[in-house]
């Protein structure tokens, strides 16, 4: 099967492993841009459980840079490739501070930022930050609404459960900053349908993707989607590097972008080979 021209490919882990060092990160970012990747992605964990405990896939000593700082660095070393957070754990952030940081990065990158957000899943991380784990879904909804208000309203004002403000301004306001919501809960699917430009599924195979998209369709039948948002863009990080046939099958399910995650622990040479392999096997 042929991979549709409309499908795009992102590169994950741009703030980890070889990309947690400046020289390697800059070289891999430029290589990915030249290879035809449409986007670079960075995830987030402020802290990791020690000792490692399920469901954390990362060891306590694994290095992971702050995604916004990493993407700002990558923006300075690239020109056209988009820059995505995959994902920001939104309820762990101050929404107005985050809104300012995101608007700044979007401005400095020339409008290349894609904001991926999720509610988080590591209770020890929330406990260390002093944020109630049980409130994370409600906080995410509240924070998204507050950020949209500060970004879009001529005289921003918002009064919610966890954040309230009026009589303030914050510029620059992004012209168009797409928002993807991640997660596999009923709330995550509702959040995507009601107010996001896209949905992001992580570590899914074809069957898992089909199941998730069925649940998104069910959510779309239950919740109203503003016409201004248009079609929901679907991004998926597959469990492993797909071949052309598998990529085409993802596209046939309705996936618009595959965000590819290299195996953990690759050095710069091996990551260079990975990018070149993707270019030959999927992009060109």
Describe the function of each predicted region.
Residues 1-284:
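Active-site-adjacent structural elements that line small-molecule/cofactor binding pockets in enzymes
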């Amino acid at each position: 099967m042929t991979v549709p021209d409309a499908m795009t490919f992102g590169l994950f882990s741009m703030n980890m492993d070889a990309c947690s060092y400046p020289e390697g990160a800059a070289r891999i970012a430029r290589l990915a841009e030249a290879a035809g990747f449409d986007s670079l992605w960075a995830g987030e964990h402020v802290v990791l459980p020690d000792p490692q405990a399920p469901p954390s896939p990362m060891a306590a000593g694994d290095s992971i840079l702050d995604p916004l700082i990493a993407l700002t660095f990558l923006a300075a070393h690239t020109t056209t490739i988009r820059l995505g957070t995959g994902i920001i754990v939104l309820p762990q952030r101050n929404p107005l501070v985050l809104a300012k940081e995101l608007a700044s990065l979007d401005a400095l990158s020339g409008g290349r930022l894609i904001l991926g957000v999720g509610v988080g899943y590591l209770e020890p991380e929330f406990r260390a930050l002093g944020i109630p784990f049980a409130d994370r879904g409600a906080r995410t909804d509240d924070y998204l609404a507050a950020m949209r208000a500060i970004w879009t309203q001529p005289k921003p004002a918002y009064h919610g459960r966890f954040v309230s403000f009026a009589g303030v301004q914050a510029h620059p306001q992004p012209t168009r900053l797409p928002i993807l919501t991640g997660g596999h809960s009923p709330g995550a699917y509702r959040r995507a349908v009601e107010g996001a430009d896209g949905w992001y599924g992580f570590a899914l195979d074809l069957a898992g993707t089909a199941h998730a998209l069925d649940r998104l369709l069910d959510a779309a039948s239950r919740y109203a989607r503003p016409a201004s948002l248009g079609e929901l863009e679907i991004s998926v990080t597959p469990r492993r590097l797909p071949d052309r046939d598998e990529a085409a099958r993802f596209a046939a399910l309705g996936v618009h972008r595959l965000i590819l995650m290299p195996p953990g622990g690759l050095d710069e040479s091996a990551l260079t080979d990975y990018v070149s392999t993707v270019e030959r096997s999927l992009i060109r």
